[in-house]
Curated annotation (Swiss-Prot):
<dbReference type="Pfam" id="PF16320">
    <property type="entry name" value="Ribosomal_L12_N"/>
</dbReference>
<keyword id="KW-0687">Ribonucleoprotein</keyword>
<dbReference type="InterPro" id="IPR008932">
    <property type="entry name" value="Ribosomal_bL12_oligo"/>
</dbReference>
<dbReference type="GO" id="GO:0003729">
    <property type="term" value="F:mRNA binding"/>
</dbReference>
<dbReference type="InterPro" id="IPR013823">
    <property type="entry name" value="Ribosomal_bL12_C"/>
</dbReference>
<dbReference type="GO" id="GO:0006412">
    <property type="term" value="P:translation"/>
</dbReference>
<comment type="similarity">
    <text>Belongs to the bacterial ribosomal protein bL12 family.</text>
</comment>
<dbReference type="GO" id="GO:0003735">
    <property type="term" value="F:structural constituent of ribosome"/>
</dbReference>
<keyword id="KW-0689">Ribosomal protein</keyword>
<protein>
    <recommendedName>
        <fullName>Large ribosomal subunit protein bL12</fullName>
    </recommendedName>
</protein>
<dbReference type="InterPro" id="IPR000206">
    <property type="entry name" value="Ribosomal_bL12"/>
</dbReference>
<dbReference type="InterPro" id="IPR036235">
    <property type="entry name" value="Ribosomal_bL12_oligo_N_sf"/>
</dbReference>
<comment type="subunit">
    <text>Homodimer. Part of the ribosomal stalk of the 50S ribosomal subunit. Forms a multimeric L10(L12)X complex, where L10 forms an elongated spine to which 2 to 4 L12 dimers bind in a sequential fashion. Binds GTP-bound translation factors.</text>
</comment>
<comment type="function">
    <text>Forms part of the ribosomal stalk which helps the ribosome interact with GTP-bound translation factors. Is thus essential for accurate translation.</text>
</comment>
<dbReference type="GO" id="GO:0022625">
    <property type="term" value="C:cytosolic large ribosomal subunit"/>
</dbReference>
<dbReference type="InterPro" id="IPR014719">
    <property type="entry name" value="Ribosomal_bL12_C/ClpS-like"/>
</dbReference>
<dbReference type="Pfam" id="PF00542">
    <property type="entry name" value="Ribosomal_L12"/>
</dbReference>
Length: 121
């Protein structure tokens, strides 16, 4: 198994920036994750003692009205149908990260109206 990992690392080292960007996008789509999530969490960890001026909107549960929640997620994020469905199916997941308090409340209200359970972090 170590040999396979070494081959993957060697391929990544040889790839161009554009190829690496495409790889990251493909991984995000395939696994329903975002590359920005760990970076935002690390940055927020050190600033928690300061006044909280940005929030992550987390979809905790889609509830019974999953189709309505998918539509709301698409409207809010601009994601395609497949990506929005993947995000909703993968709950809990962040819908938006690092948004202002007012925008976070608006997003929360829209998603809760659609039937979702939302947590602001």
């Amino acid at each position: 198994m170590a040999l396979n990992i070494e081959n993957i690392i060697a391929e990544i080292k040889e790839a161009s920036i554009l190829e690496l960007n495409d790889l990251v996008k493909a991984i995000e789509e395939e696994f329903g994750v975002t590359a920005a999530a760990p970076v935002a969490a690390a940055a927020a960890g050190g600033a928690e003692e300061a006044a909280k001026d940005s929030f992550d909107v987390e979809l905790t549960s889609a509830g019974d009205k999953k189709v309505g929640v998918i539509k709301a997620v698409r409207e809010i994020t601009g994601l395609g149908l497949k990506e929005a469905k993947g995000l909703v199916d993968g709950a809990p997941a962040n819908v938006k990260e690092g948004v202002a308090a007012a925008e976070a409340e608006e997003i929360k209200a829209k998603l809760e109206e659609a039937g979702a359970t939302i947590t602001l972090k």
